[in-house]
Every structure is written in structure tokens, then in C-alpha cells.
Amino acid sequence: MTQDTLRFAANLSMLYTELPFMQRFAAAAKDGFKGVEFLFPYAFEAQEIAAQLKQHGLQQVLFNTPAGGADTAGMNAAWDAGMRGTASVVGCENEFQAGVLRALAYAQVLDCPRIHVMAGLLPEGVSADDARPAAQATYIANLHWAAAQAAKVGIDVVIEPINQRDVPRFFLNRQDHAHAIVQAVGAANLKVQMDLYHCQVVEGDVAMKLRQYLPTGRVGHIQVAGVPQRHEPDVGELNYPYLFSAIQEAGYGGWIGCEYRPARGAVTGGTSDGLGWLRRMATGDWA
């Protein structure tokens, strides 16, 4: 198996973290990546990032809407404050809309074709069963609005099931739930971001999930990491050569984001040293 039909993007929030953010673009390009993704760009001017993309021949393939906040300061502080999106959070509709509009403005400058809208957390002190109906209604209404705004500028919106081991109380956890939401909203530019790490942690049966959902055309982005420690794809319990073959066989033509923590950590060369799996794919040695 080779990577001829698979396109891998470096996640610059998790890879090359020994370097300042703006130096990670050059490092990714040097290692052969053609695409990049990251969590949030909002601490930097969009034009600064666009210049790095152009200089190093990289395509921006994905980033997140803000984790919260209604202004620049709030958006930049939201993640560290424990926020994980506002799409399903009752009463945060104005905050949600401000974040989506900010993300779309950045996406247009970066020529990025999709943005990830994080679902958010279920409220504390309320049982999940009691909180879910209102969260679901809020989520669907917000995604209707976000997809309509994004469609005006030719951008896709993706939603990602995330496991509750890593993010307790996260609203969206399962692939079937995400696809049901996409169908309920009914917008052509709303799709699922399928993170195989989260899928394995929550429900397993990853290859069958790929074969079930990729042919629908509703998977807009894939991400990979080893399980259980979220290191390189060749570290852990998942058989990624088999899964990459399944992705190829399903005819998936989108990007695969490398959203993992290098096993060597944030040390000089740590990311590059861990890319043996990608180099082996390029030469067909990882069968």
C-alpha cells in the first residue's frame, strides 16, 4: 500500500510543538506535508498565516471555530478556560454566531474549504438525559444557521464526535448521532469530521464504520491517531495499514489530519522522528 491516493495534513497544534507556531509551517513542509490544520488561528492575523501557507506551498484544510467567547479576547481565552464549543449550549447563540462569523472571515483569507464547529459540553449539575433534548434542539438550529452562512462563501461546516474520556460531558460522541444530525439539518455543506481515535475510544468497529459512512459522501474530513495514548498511528492498538486500505477502497478523496501527540513529546525533531509510518507508506513498505 502507498499513499498515492491519500492526502495527509499536519495538525500544527499538536505536531512540531517544540517550535513557535509560525515556524511549524516550514517544518511541516520540510517533512513533505502538503496540507495543514490546527485548532485555532485567532491569536494571529489571518494575513500572517496566509503568508506562511504561500511561502511553504501548503494548503489550509481545516480549523475550528472559537471554543467560546464573543470578542477576540474571549475567543482566545475560551479553550484554556475549559470551553469546548457553544453549538449545543443553550443561551450561547449570540456567542456561537460571533464565533462562526469570525471563523468564516479567517477561512476566506486562508482559502480554507471547511471549518469545524465544536458541539460544546452538556451542563453540569443536570443529568445527561434531562439536558440532551434542549441541547439537541439548540445544536440543530445553530447548525442550520452556520451552514447557511458558510454556504454563502462556499465553505463546508463539519461536526466531530469526541469521546467523553478525554472531554467529559461533550455533547456529540457517536458517528451515528453525527450523521443523524447532518440528515436532520439537511444542508449539503454540513458534513461529519470522522476522527478514528475518538471513534475507537467510543465505539470501536472502525473499519466497518468507514465502510458504512464514507460511501455516503457525508464524511468531510478524517483525522488519525494511535489508541489509547493518541500518539503516532503506528503506536497502539489500531491497525492503520488496514484502515488506510479501507479508506482507499471506499474512494475517499479528502484530507486526513494527523492530530496526534508525538510519542517523543515536544523535543527537537520529535515530530519528524515519529513520521516513519508516513515515510513507509510513501515507499509502499507499510503493507
Give the ranges of each region predicted by the language model:
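Histidine-acidic metal/acid-base catalytic patches
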Residues: 1-32, 42, 54-57, 102, ...
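N-terminal small/glycine-rich loop or linker at the start of catalytic domains
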Residues: 2-13, 64-86, 119-127
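Alpha/beta catalytic barrel-like cores
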Residues: 24, 38-41, 84-85, 92
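Short, basic, glycine/proline-bearing loop/turn elements
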Residues: 32-35, 89
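Conserved beta-strand positions in the central sheet of alpha/beta enzyme cores
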Residues: 37, 61-64, 116, 158, ...
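Glycine-rich, proline-tolerant flexible connector loops at the mouths of alpha/beta enzymes
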Residues: 37-56, 64, 119-123, 127, ...
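Short coil-to-beta-strand
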Residues: 56-74, 106-119
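Active-site acidic/histidine proton-transfer and metal-coordination neighborhood
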Residues: 80-191, 201, 285
